[in-house]
Amino acid sequence: MPVITLPDGSQRHYDHPVSPMDVALDIGPGLAKATIAGRVNGELVDACDLIENDATLAIITAKDEEGLEIIRHSCAHLLGHAIKQLWPHTKMAIGPVVDNGFYYDVDLDRTLTQEDVEALEKRMHELAEKNYDVIKKKVSWHDARETFVKRGETYKVAILDENIAHDDKPGLYHHEEYVDMCRGPHVPNMRFCHHFKLMKTAGAYWRGDSNNKMLQRIYGTAWADKKALNAYLQRLEEAAKRDHRKIGKQLDLYHMQEEAPGMVFWHNDGWTIFRELEVFVRSKLKEYQYQEVKGPFMMDRVLWEKTGHWDNYKDAMFTTSSENREYCIKPMNCPGHVQIFNQGLKSYRDLPLRMAEFGSCHRNEPSGALHGLMRVRGFTQDDAHIFCTEEQIRDEVNACIRMVYDMYSPFGFEKIVVKLSTRPDKRIGSDEMWDRAEADLAVALEENNIPFEYQLGEGAFYGPKIEFTLYDCLDRAWQCGTVQLDFSLPSRLSASYVGEDNERKVPVMIHRAILGSMERFIGILTEEFAGFFPTWLAPVQVVVMNITDSQSGYVNELTQKLQNAGIRVKADLRNEKIGFKIREHTLRRVPYMLVCGDKEVEAGKVAVRTRRGKDLGSLDVNDVIEKLQQEIRSRSLQQLEE
């Protein structure tokens, strides 16, 4: 009979099989009321599942991350329950958990309107407020199939036929008259599922295959309590205000159009930001001793077959042909960099060789996945590859890590999560090689006093990697930086150097990206700063404006002086009221507005206002220029008044 060991090390002895709910009741009624599921020997199980042998047990409640995920999964079933009541002929497909919520794909003979979604959410609340018990039944494959055949659930039948072994016992979850199939676990009672909201609908092909029927996907969010739900909805509201697509249009940074899906048309101001980022990155490339190169836009398919990309990545590659040869438009820069490395004999004395490129890449992303600058088909990578010996890995990774933090610093990201992905089951190379490589990455992180977590088995087959994830002001995660060891590609493309022993050796290749896609990073910055770019990045840094025509000459003279000082400046000599001009340039998020009236002309000064509405008073022109130059040169996040 089972001995149950709890997280605090205490044990409870039973003379019969028990469920997590039984143990929770044994501990106390308060815990039992809060119990959503259990973790038995590390595996999540339903609160009603019986434990027959000795086991470790942790009770899962809504306070646990797993508990919240279970609530969301059960809300997907609740959605199914409600939609079958409103539209009984609906066929249910799949309803998984996603970040912050859930969705369900349904086959419905009507296109859901906003009114339909509101009615569906209302019915979900009515059902949840009944606080009914969710009943789990393990049945044979044949019984499960018969259940769904009788209910006309063709997609569930297809899942059983194609994905579940005949000797398996699927779990059926009964929500009153509604039945769904799932691995589980799920909440024991719907009292846990009161705090949710349906968010939107979209189209989705069955099994993600465009040859299959288009279904309707209903998205929802769910939380453990009302406070968390409201906080999330407020974050969404703030995110909508910061949406880079909206701000990009307001500030005339770029546009996209149907004739070039996923490709960016950069306007002057947006391209100014892009070029300033390039200048910044180039300054760091020089500091960290990189060569800058430029590879071709496309290369023969034969090369991509050698690298393995054709076998594993061809669906994401654009191709073209000429004179009976097929070419691939590059989705990444690494094969081209190996070709540059291969030109001329290399010695160990030439290593490490650090090669960087602002590489123009293209990937055939699904049209439904495209999203402004965040998910595009054409993008520029701040990509680099380091060719080195095994003995140089640690020092090179160390330098990469320093460079990553050095480059993130001017943008003010306060939270950076670092993960080290280790060897997968399927991999190349010896265990000794992986031992050393993983140790080199870990030690490099430790030497830089960077906390990190392991992602066991999540490395690529050709080497371990470090991932850097930025969290923005809304606590959204953006995975940008990567340091990836590669023991495969150099040998596939016959890269070699002559070692100290005069023998040919294959170099180790380190893939290194910091900003990632330049387009995506500009999208991230646009939302992080809500369009209030720091002065060094702002497309227009200063606007000089007159109050009446009599100051026009002084404005032009001052504008020229600012231009000569390397400041991006515009003159506004329009015959408009000064309040109108100030408001317009404030909405354009111009960092500084210099107002010139008769007093300023007479004193050789200028009245300085900021886009945040602060009046800095009348200041000496040369002092203003000097302070602006210092702010821009230092790439400061702070403005003069701050």
UniProtKB/Swiss-Prot annotation:
One of its GO terms (molecular function) is ATP binding. Residues 1-61 form the TGS domain. Gene3D superfamilies: 3.10.20.30, 3.30.54.20, Anticodon-binding domain (3.40.50.800), Bira Bifunctional Protein, Domain 2 (3.30.930.10), Threonyl-trna Synthetase, Chain A, domain 2 (3.30.980.10). The keyword tRNA-binding applies. Zn(2+) binds at C334, H385, H511. It holds the Pfam family TGS. Its EC number is 6.1.1.3. SMART domains: tRNA_SAD (SM00863). InterPro entries: aa-tRNA-synt_IIb, aa-tRNA-synth_II, aa-tRNA-synth_II/BPL/LPL, Anticodon-bd, Anticodon-bd_dom_sf, Beta-grasp_dom_sf, TGS, TGS-like. Residues 243-534 are annotated as: Catalytic. Binds 1 zinc ion per subunit. It catalyses: tRNA(Thr) + L-threonine + ATP = L-threonyl-tRNA(Thr) + AMP + diphosphate + H(+). It comes from the Bacteria. Belongs to the class-II aminoacyl-tRNA synthetase family. Homodimer. Catalyzes the attachment of threonine to tRNA(Thr) in a two-step reaction: L-threonine is first activated by ATP to form Thr-AMP and then transferred to the acceptor end of tRNA(Thr). Also edits incorrectly charged L-seryl-tRNA(Thr). This is Threonine--tRNA ligase. The gene is thrS.
